[in-house]
Amino acid sequence: MKRNVKLGWLMTLLMTAALTVPARGQVLNSAASTITLNAVLSQSVSVTLSANAVNFTLTSGSANNPGSTSITATTTWTLKPSVGSLQVYAFFSNSASALTDGAGNNIASADFQISNNGGAFNALTNTVPFGGANAGLQLSSTPILGNNRTGTRNDVMNFNINLVPLPNLPAGTYTGTLTIQAQAI
């Protein structure tokens, strides 16, 4: 019987040892350390053009002297909530000599016309935020609301030179620089 008791105790001891989970040490945590994160999305407005040259074959005294190609101005923006609108402008630096032959003969901005997105042709006769006085045209105005703080728009421009006001314009090569620029206000 003693032997059975010893065997019983031994079995109990073995079962207890097998079922006992080893004790873990006390959990010790460090102090929390933080990381400050800063992410900046800057405001931006950009204009890209599908081409940068237009040629004209002029007919003396003619109202219809179309440009060789249309140009698309793609305006892209990312703006703050305080911005209310985005305008796109076309302008020359001087209204009296939008195009010149370099010998004193000029084509004024009032004789240069743009049709924007299939609309009527308009001369560049307005004073806009850029360029010379009476040498510009507002192509578009986009209200900036909560749903378009980031966006893109296209302005497809066709060009014409009206030579009716210049019946005595001498033959020559006339060059000029038209600038397209956007403004967010």
What are these regions (language model features)?
Residues 1-11:
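Bacterial N-terminal signal peptides that target proteins for export
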Residues 11-18:
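Bacterial N-terminal signal peptides
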Residues 20-22:
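N-terminal signal peptide c-region/cleavage motif recognized by signal peptidases
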Residues 24-120, 126, 136-185:
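N-terminal small/polar-rich segments of proteins
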Residues 130-134:
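Active-site-proximal mixed secondary-structure blocks
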